[in-house]
Amino acid sequence: MGKRLISQNRGRGTPKYRSPTHKRKGAVKYRSYDEMEKDGKILGTVIDILHDPGRSAPVAKVKFANDEERLVLIPEGIQVGEEIECGISAEIKPGNVLPLGEIPEGIPVYNIETIPGDGGKLVRSGGCYAHVISHDVGKTIVRLPSGFSKVLNPACRATVGVVAGGGRKEKPFVKAGKKYHSLSAKAVAWPKVRGVAMNAVDHPYGGGRHQHIGKPSSVSRHTSPGRKVGHIASRRTGKR
């Protein structure tokens, strides 16, 4: 009898494929959207900058004027001791948090909310930023790093600036061990072995005197889990 496929183990949720979220510093999101931010602003001070395992950007611990502490994504150029502002009347300055409707066109922003008060969902990776393209009645258009333009509620908050940690991809890993430990902080199994390179007991494409599939790669949508590899319920295969 063959062994479980990687996709079966991943679906079961074994420790190897489970994200090690217990190593994280905590939730990185905006403070609750209260009247203080809707009508004015609240000041916060950066008291520490932390490395968060599994995240491509550093996070800052910010203490606000009401003694509330939050972990937030910081932009390039922010250091310990600097003040940030959150609210509708905040200044347009890197690190400050404002509703999209109050940010001028062409300003780079990150950590954008999709629903007002959700804490920030879009553009959170190191070195990333989006641009506010235009404003209209009841909507703001933002161009994301992918080039896609998204229509959002003007009350959705965003941070002015570019996420810190840019240029992280410019330095090569050089050694396989470094890449392994880097990806072990995420729910990524690495390296990824090809099915034809495995033994017959490990994969439907394994075994044989040379590396070949040896059977059709198209399988039914309703086939058994241990055989469901390759082109699943494909309408067509090959070059168009």
UniProtKB/Swiss-Prot annotation:
Molecular functions (GO terms): rRNA binding; structural constituent of ribosome
Gene Ontology annotations of biological process type: cytoplasmic translation
Keyword match Calcium: no
Alphabetized Pfam families for the sequence: Ribosomal_L2 (PF00181), Ribosomal_L2_C (PF03947)
InterPro entries found in the cross-reference section: NA-bd_OB-fold (IPR012340), Rib_uL2_dom2 (IPR014722), Ribosomal_uL2 (IPR002171), Ribosomal_uL2_arc_euk (IPR023672), Ribosomal_uL2_C (IPR022669), Ribosomal_uL2_CS (IPR022671), Ribosomal_uL2_dom3 (IPR014726), Ribosomal_uL2_RNA-bd_dom (IPR022666)
Gene3D superfamilies (alphabetical): 2.30.30.30, Nucleic acid-binding proteins, Ribosomal protein L2, domain 3
Compositionally biased region (Polar residues): 1-11
Keyword rRNA-binding among UniProt keywords: yes
Signal peptide coordinates: none
SMART domains listed in its UniProt record: Ribosomal_L2, Ribosomal_L2_C
Role this protein plays: One of the primary rRNA binding proteins. Required for association of the 30S and 50S subunits to form the 70S ribosome, for tRNA binding and peptide bond formation. It has been suggested to have peptidyltransferase activity; this is somewhat controversial. Makes several contacts with the 16S rRNA in the 70S ribosome.
HAMAP family hit by this protein: Ribosomal_uL2_A (MF_01320_A)
Subunit field text: Part of the 50S ribosomal subunit. Forms a bridge to the 30S subunit in the 70S ribosome.
Family: Belongs to the universal ribosomal protein uL2 family.
Name assigned to this protein: Large ribosomal subunit protein uL2
Gene name per UniProt: rpl2
